């Protein structure tokens, strides 16, 4: 299966939605309920994390289900740390790949399919190296431990073209999110 959505559509939806929910559960019915609730709430980009036994099998079924039940939902795979796992999720229909780290072997796998790869980065060098490898969106992870909103703000000064999302110690409260948004996250 090829990605249902183009790289440009994924990027636009990430910006429009303003957040990418991250979730895993071994119970596919719980996953469906969470995805459906997010979809009904206006979310159009969802990251299913590769954090359990047979997670790829659950993801493959969710892609088929979402195609019918949530046709505008852009599903991607997270917690992808190697090129083989990226290839597996791309074959199952992932529209984007996210990792907790930057693995330069994953970038060409995604780039060949024009599928976004958003690696976790914890320094200006990692962000810059990921961008050089074709990563349009980088993820600061673990954001709260790497330096918080001030880190993002300071990175955006010299690398102002960057598209940065954050995960790890980011809470869904106005008090927590406001400084991140002001710092310039995606």
Language-model features, listed with the residues they occupy:
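Conserved N-terminal beta1-alpha1 strand-loop-helix module at the mouth
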Residues: 2-76, 80-84, 88-92, 161, ...
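Active-site-adjacent beta->alpha loops and helix N-cap segments on the catalytic face
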Residues: 3-8, 28, 50-66, 83-87, ...
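C-terminal binding/interaction regions
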Residues: 167, 178-179, 186
């Amino acid at each position: 299966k090829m990605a249902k959505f183009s790289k440009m559509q994924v990027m636009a939806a990430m910006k429009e939605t303003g957040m990418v929910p991250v979730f895993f559960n071994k119970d596919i019915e719980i996953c469906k309920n969470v995805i459906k609730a997010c979809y009904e709430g206006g979310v159009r980009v969802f990251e299913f994390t590769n954090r359990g036994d047979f997670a790829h099998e659950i993801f493959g079924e969710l892609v088929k289900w979402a195609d019918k039940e949530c046709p505008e939902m852009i599903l991607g795979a997270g917690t992808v740390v190697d090129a083989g796992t990226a290839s597996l999720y791309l074959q199952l229909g992932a529209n984007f790949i996210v990792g907790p780290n930057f693995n330069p072997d994953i970038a060409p796998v995604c780039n060949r399919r024009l599928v976004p790869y958003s690696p976790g980065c914890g320094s200006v060098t990692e962000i810059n190296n990921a961008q050089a490898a074709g990563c349009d969106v980088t993820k600061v992870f673990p954001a709260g431990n790497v330096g918080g909103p001030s880190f993002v703000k300071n990175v955006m000064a010299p690398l102002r073209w960057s598209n940065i999302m954050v995960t790890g110690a980011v809470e869904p409260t106005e008090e927590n999110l406001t400084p991140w948004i002001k710092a310039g996250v995606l």
